[in-house]
Amino acid sequence: MAFIIGWRRYWRGTGARWGGWPAFADAMSATATMRNLGGDNSGDGAGCPGPDDRNSLARRHYHHATFYGFMLCFASTSTGTIYHYLLGREAPYGYLELPVVLGTVGGIMLCVGTAGLWREKRRMEPAVRPLAKLGMDYAFIWVLFWVSATGLVLLALRETSFMGLTLAIHLGLVYGFFLVLPYSKFVHGLYRFAALLADAGEARRSAM
C-alpha cells in the first residue's frame, strides 16, 4: 500500500500523463535494459565517468546484477510457495530443484551486485556524492547483501547443526528488510520507472 500511495503521489506531483500501452512497453524496455544508465539519455553505452575520468558501465552492470538477482530470489520464494501449498511438497528441496537453483543464482547475483554498488559509491567524488543520503544507501545495500549472503550460507549449512541459528539470522534479516522496504532506497526503482513512463509518453506525443 505504501508503494502504491507513494507512486501515485509522485505521478501526480510531476504532472505526468498516461501515454498508452506502447509508451508503457517503451518504459518497460528501458527499465529492463537500463539503457539510460549509460552516461547520457541516448543510451549509447558511453558509461558513467569515474574518479579516473574514464567512462565505465560498471554501475549499470551492478544494477543489473542487483535487480535481476532480487527478481530471481523472488521467483524462488514464489516457486517454493507453489511447491508447498499447491503441490504438497515440503522443504528442504534438492539442490537441483527449481526453488534452490533460482535462489542460489539470484543470491550470488545479489551479493555481486550490492558489493559492486557499494564499491562504486565509495569511488565517487565527494563533490557529487550526496552525503546526506549515504547512510540510507549504505544501509539498504548492506542489508540486501547480508540477506542474500546468509541465504547462501543457510543453503550450505542446512544439513548441519548450525542450520537453526543460520535460519534465525537469515529470517530476521528478511523480516527487517521487508519492514523498511517502503521507506528505503528500493523505492527509487518505482520512481525511476514512473519517470521513464512519463518520458516515453511525452516522446510519443511529440512524435505525433
Locations of regions flagged by a protein language model:
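Membrane-embedded alpha-helical bundles of multi-pass integral membrane proteins
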Residues: 1-208
